[in-house]
Amino acid sequence: MAKLVNKLVDSFDHDEAPAPDVGCVRAVLAELVLTFLFVFTGVSASMAAGAGGKPGEAMPMATLAAVAIAHALAAGVLVTAGFHVSGGHLNPAVTVGILVRGHITKLRALLYVAAQLLASSLACILLRYLSGGMVTPVHALGAGIRPMQGLVMEVILTFSLLFVTYAMILDPRSQVRTIGPLLTGLIVGANSLAGGNFTGASMNPARSFGPAMATGVWTNHWVYWIGPLLGGSLAGFVYESLFMVNKTHEPLLNGDI
């Protein structure tokens, strides 16, 4: 009888449902918090600098510089802060650009993107309340810029962002892997200066999604999805195919589900 009881107990132990991946849950929560902070900082800085003018109106260089610096600092610090927890993506284009080369699982990538979009929406809704209804700047094409031109611009800007990410962080030969996440802020700032008056230099579908959702302005919004996702994916393929000599590189995140 005792043996029978022991066998039953053992069977329950073995059939017990697997524990949830706590690391994945923490990573998704980190993406939620980090993306919220990034979008909140970027959008509020744009509002404070007076970047919420008429759609297509060029920003003065001082305004553009202020917006670029805010995004560069926020991106560099927040990516560094979350790198050891989630990889510090903050951006669906980064997540997809890393996914295409197998550095993250499809399920985790999907959860990351959902968290990033939710965070961006919450940040912009809160900002509308805290700012007393100030105009929320929405990414829009500059005067005379056609959608296809804007699309190509976003492809190139995001390509450079992911190319730098692969070169400084994912490539095992990189000599700056420990500070690579912080340095990514520099390319974000440079690209913001380069493309700010053409497309707004989004490079990040989540950064564009929140303001569009909060204001209901979706004009040419597809440009800010297709461009960054295509640019990020191309960068992943190009860098690993042509420049990643050691194919036994370490994945960005160990223990992905």
From Swiss-Prot:
The name this protein goes by in its record: Aquaporin TIP4-2
Top-level taxon of the source organism: Eukaryota
Listed GO biological process terms: water transport
Domain statement: Aquaporins contain two tandem repeats each containing three membrane-spanning domains and a pore-forming loop with the signature motif Asn-Pro-Ala (NPA).
Lineage of origin: Eukaryota, Viridiplantae, Streptophyta, Embryophyta, Tracheophyta
Membrane-traversing stretches: 32-52, 63-83, 107-127, 150-170, 178-198, 225-245
Function: Aquaporins facilitate the transport of water and small neutral solutes across cell membranes.
Pfam families according to UniProt: MIP (PF00230)
